[in-house]
């Protein structure tokens, strides 16, 4: 998987993703990261890529041409056109299902806005997907872009080392993950549930399913209702 990030702050992207799981994935060659500085495509010596908005209003807007040129420079080096994802609070909410869809791509171009956003004309010209990570506003698209890259990278074979880890994550099957415990067996008078110490894998699996359903019912009733509609047989796990 190759990620190409169009940004005004490439060092933010590189530093933010250069450690932990994504950093190791890049070292192994499982994913690559190409942080493209949009300022490199400015048509002036000051590398200025923003200007005032027509019609008035506060703040500056990223201009169309530098964004377009940066995107076309990346696309020209690919075997086939890549999807261009614009990180914006106006986009559809990013989900695990969307991450699974994106993980099937060979290349992804992620566009990060800044200031008051980007000239609408270039968005209409190059963007294939608009994605939001939540109903709030950030300073720029870099943090959301890193969220997308981290989430998608986890789904690339070999990145986690143990494929089961990703398969049991929250949202992978439409439910929140069950609670987990490690040593010691007793901590501050709190004991690990006895079923997890029983060695009975069937009982452990049932307990985890029950806990996953109950946790989802309490914390995300919207997900719970959807899951139960799609899996009516799961009622046998409900207490």
Give the positions of each predicted feature.
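SAM-dependent methyltransferases
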Residues: 1, 184-239
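N-terminal nucleotide/polyanion-binding subdomain common to many enzyme families
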Residues: 1-75, 201-223
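Hydrophobic/aromatic beta-strand patches that form the interior of the parallel beta-sheet core
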Residues: 4-6, 34-36, 83-85, 108-109, ...
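Short, solvent-exposed amphipathic alpha-helical segments in soluble enzyme
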Residues: 20-24, 100-104, 126
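Short glycine-enriched loops at secondary-structure junctions
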Residues: 38-41, 114-118
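S-adenosyl-L-methionine/SAH cofactor-binding core of RNA-modifying enzymes
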Residues: 63-114, 120
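Structured adenosyl-cofactor binding patch, chiefly the S-adenosyl-L-methionine
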Residues: 122-169
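Internal, active-site/partner-interface "lid" segment
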Residues: 143, 155-194
């Amino acid at each position: 998987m190759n990620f190409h990030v169009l940004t005004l702050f490439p060092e933010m992207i590189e530093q933010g993703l250069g450690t932990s799981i994504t950093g190791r994935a890049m070292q192994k060659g499982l994913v690559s990261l190409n942080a493209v500085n949009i300022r490199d495509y400015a048509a002036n010596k000051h590398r200025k890529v923003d200007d005032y908005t027509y019609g008035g209003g506060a703040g500056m807007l990223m201009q169309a041409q530098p964004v377009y040129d940066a995107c076309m420079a990346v696309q020209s080096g690919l075997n086939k056109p890549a999807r261009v994802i614009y990180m914006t609070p106006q986009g559809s909410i990013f989900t695990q299902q969307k991450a699974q869809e994106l993980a099937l791509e060979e290349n992804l171009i992620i566009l990060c806005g800044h200031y008051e956003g980007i000239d609408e004309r270039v968005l209409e010209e190059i963007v294939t997907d608009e994605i939001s990570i939540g109903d709030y506003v950030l300073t720029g698209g870099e943090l959301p872009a890193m969220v997308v890259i981290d989430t998608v990278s986890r789904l690339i074979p070999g990145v986690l080392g143990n494929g089961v880890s990703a398969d049991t994550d929250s949202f992978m099957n439409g439910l929140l993950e069950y609670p987990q415990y490690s040593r010691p067996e007793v901590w501050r008078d709190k004991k690990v549930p006895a079923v997890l110490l029983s060695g009975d894998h069937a009982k452990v699996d049932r307990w985890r399913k029950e806990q996953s359903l109950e946790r989802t019912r309490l914390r995300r009733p919207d997900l719970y209702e959807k899951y139960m509609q799609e899996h009516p047989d799961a009622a046998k796990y409900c207490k």
